[in-house]
Every structure is written in structure tokens, then in C-alpha cells.
Amino acid sequence: MQTEQPPKESQTENTVSEPQEKALRTVFDDKINFNLKHPLARPWTLWFLMPPTPGLEWNELQKNIITFNSVEEFWGIHNNINPASSLPIKSDYSFFREGVRPEWEDVHNKTGGKWAFQNKGRGGNALDEMWLTTVLAAIGETLDPTGQEVMGVVINMRKGFYRLAVWTKSCNNREVLMEIGTRFKQVLNLPRSETIEFSAHEDSSKSGSTRAKTRMSV
């Protein structure tokens, strides 16, 4: 007497087919052909400030380059722009929250200030590394314990020196601002002997210089 054999379990029921396995690729698996994105908490915009150009006002020199909202998009941008250490004299890179211009007069910045670290020379690879870690800390939301204060980060390339800065929304919330300054200094991996300083945009605007009086230091 023949007995009926139970149906064989399909080998595909509990396994993922090869095409499916290859369907989801992150930037960590394939730096070129990734298709799975890791979203950021908010969109960010890359700005480039051109060196002074005859016939152009200052705000016309500030160029909105691109807005992005994922880790993968950031790396795509970072890997296709010139390093910070090669910026022309009197030019800047800025990464700011979408909708915020890297200007003192912007409504999101006018009552705020900035933490800044300044050093001689062009910085080379060390500067590029500090700038990258600063940008990653900003867009990764690890500089700001509240998630509300940090508006953006800036690298200024000037004759004989460079400046890295974190711009904040306010200038009076001392406890939070000191925490941001402490974290910024840690991100830069500075020794205790080095100091970073906080100044208010209002003071800079009145003096007509980015080197306004220091309100706090770490």
C-alpha cells in the first residue's frame, strides 16, 4: 500500500532569494551603488562663500550649493568637493539647517552667537579631519543636548589662518552653550591648553568684525 508523501517544504519559504539579498545595499556595503538611505534628523544645506568679486555684493557671494537629508547624500557631497584646506583665501564652507542662511542678519541667527577655534596656516590634512568631524557632529545632532541651538558650522579660510565655528540660535543660554562648547572642543580633539571662545553675533555686527569680545571660553 502506498502512503501519500507529505508535500516538501519549499526551500524558498524560509530563505531570502539571491536577488532579494542584493536588493538592499547601504553605503557601508557599496559606496557607489547603495540604495538604502539613513535619514538625518533634519535636512542640511551646503553653502560656499566665494572670495570678494568686483560687482557682487557680499550676499551675492554666498552660494546655496545643495540640500541633503541622509547620511549617504552627505558622503556623496563630501567625496565630490574640494577639501577645506584647499579653499581659496577669503572663502568659506558652511553647513546649515535648511532654511537658515550663514549670515548674522538671518532671523534664526541674529540673537545668537558662535563658538570658534582659530589657528595659523592652512591646516592641511589635520584641518580637513577637524572640519569633517565638526560637520558630522552637527548633522548627527551630537553637539547640541537640546537639538534646538546649533544652526550650522563654518570654516573660514583667511590669509595666514583658518577658523572653525559652530553657530548657535541664542547667546544667553549659558548652561547649554557651555555644553556645546565643551563638546565642540572634544570633537576637535584639542589639548586642554587650547581655548575656544564664544562671541555674540550682535557684538560682531556692531564692531564690524568677526573677532568680537569673548563672552565665554572653554
Swiss-Prot record:
It holds the Pfam family IF4E. Residues 1-20, 198-218 are annotated as: Disordered. eIF4F is a multi-subunit complex, the composition of which varies with external and internal environmental conditions. It is composed of at least eIF4A, eIF4E and eIF4G. eIF4E is also known to interact with other partners. One of its GO terms (cellular component) is cytoplasmic stress granule. One of its GO terms (biological process) is nuclear-transcribed mRNA catabolic process, nonsense-mediated decay. The keyword Phosphoprotein does not apply. Keywords: Initiation factor, Protein biosynthesis, RNA-binding, Translation regulation. Residues 1-11 have a biased composition (Basic and acidic residues). GO terms for molecular function: RNA 7-methylguanosine cap binding; translation initiation factor activity. PANTHER family: EUKARYOTIC TRANSLATION INITIATION FACTOR 4E RELATED, EUKARYOTIC TRANSLATION INITIATION FACTOR 4E-1. The gene is tif451. This is Eukaryotic translation initiation factor 4E-1. Recognizes and binds the 7-methylguanosine-containing mRNA cap during an early step in the initiation of protein synthesis and facilitates ribosome binding by inducing the unwinding of the mRNAs secondary structures. Belongs to the eukaryotic initiation factor 4E family.
